[in-house]
């Protein structure tokens, strides 16, 4: 996967699908499957964020996976059942991109939750549940929801994986490259990481890493990427925006 700045929501959706495909390859080729709901990796991301970026932080976590009909429920019934098991309101039905979609937008303990279930075919659907928070209390609540939602997806027969992106700013006018060096120094103090891919332009530096201690990963060529870091200079404010993704970034940076 090329490591570059995602431009726009449509591309972000494509990236999410590519992440899921990479997860499928990675999980299928593991002798022991990675944990589907390892809260320690999310706490590791928060710890890194507290060290390398200034507050406020924005954290986005996405669960995503496939559902296949088993003859007992149609997609609408299954979407309603999953929404109830997540303690969310009933789904709203709409058509998006020519596909029936069932959606819920809600807030849980200050965490913004977006539930999206889209029918791909008569007996197959694709689900993305996104949680977003900022601030210490909300970040703690999101960590709990991440684990709860992973368990609920599993109990509803959906083999899902999660990814997370943390975003914050670094004050002061510094080139993206020097900010990236400072961020990397913080990462290397906590874990062994090997740079595997890199992208750079006039205002952005993005690196992807192999991190053996992290169990979540995505296949990219002959490598398994476990973490992506991007630094983007905001020329209007003079500060730099830092985004850290496990295993890769799936929001615009």
Q: What feature does the model see in each segment?
A:
Residues 80-176:
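Extracytoplasmic beta-rich ectodomain segments of secreted or membrane-anchored proteins
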Residues 169-223:
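Intrinsically disordered, low-complexity segments enriched in Gly and acidic/Ser/Thr residues
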Residues 67, 133-137, 170-172, 233, ...:
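Beta-strand elements of well-folded, non-transmembrane domains
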Residues 214-253:
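A cross-kingdom marker for long, charged
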Residues 1-107:
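N-terminal leader/presequence regions that precede the main folded/catalytic core
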Residues 67-74, 137, 141, 175-179, ...:
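Extracytoplasmic/periplasmic, Sec-exported soluble proteins
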């Amino acid at each position: 996967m090329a490591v570059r700045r995602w431009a726009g929501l449509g591309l972000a959706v494509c990236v999410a699908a590519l992440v899921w495909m990479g997860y499928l390859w990675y999980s299928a080729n593991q002798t022991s499957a990675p944990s589907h709901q390892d809260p320690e990796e999310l706490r590791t991301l928060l710890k890194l964020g507290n060290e390398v970026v200034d507050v406020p932080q924005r954290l986005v976590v996405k669960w995503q996976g496939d559902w296949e009909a088993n003859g007992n429920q149609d997609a609408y019934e299954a979407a309603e059942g999953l929404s109830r098991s997540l303690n969310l309101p009933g789904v709203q039905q709409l058509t998006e991109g020519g596909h029936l979609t069932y959606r819920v937008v809600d807030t849980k303990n200050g965490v913004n939750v977006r539930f999206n279930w889209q029918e791909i075919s008569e007996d197959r659907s694709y689900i993305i549940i996104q949680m977003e928070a900022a601030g210490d209390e909300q970040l703690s609540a999101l960590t709990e929801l991440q684990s709860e939602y992973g368990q609920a997806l599993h109990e509803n027969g959906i083999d899902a994986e999660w990814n997370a992106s943390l975003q914050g700013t670094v004050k002061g006018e510094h080139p993206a490259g020097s900010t990236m060096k400072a961020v990397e120094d913080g990462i290397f103090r906590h874990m062994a990481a090997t740079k595997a891919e890199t992208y750079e332009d006039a205002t952005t530096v993005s690196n992807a890493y192999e991190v053996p201690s992290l169990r979540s990963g995505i296949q990219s060529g002959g490598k398994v990427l476990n973490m992506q870091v991007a630094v983007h200079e905001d020329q209007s404010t003079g500060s730099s925006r830092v985004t850290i993704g496990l295993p890769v970034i799936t929001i615009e940076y």
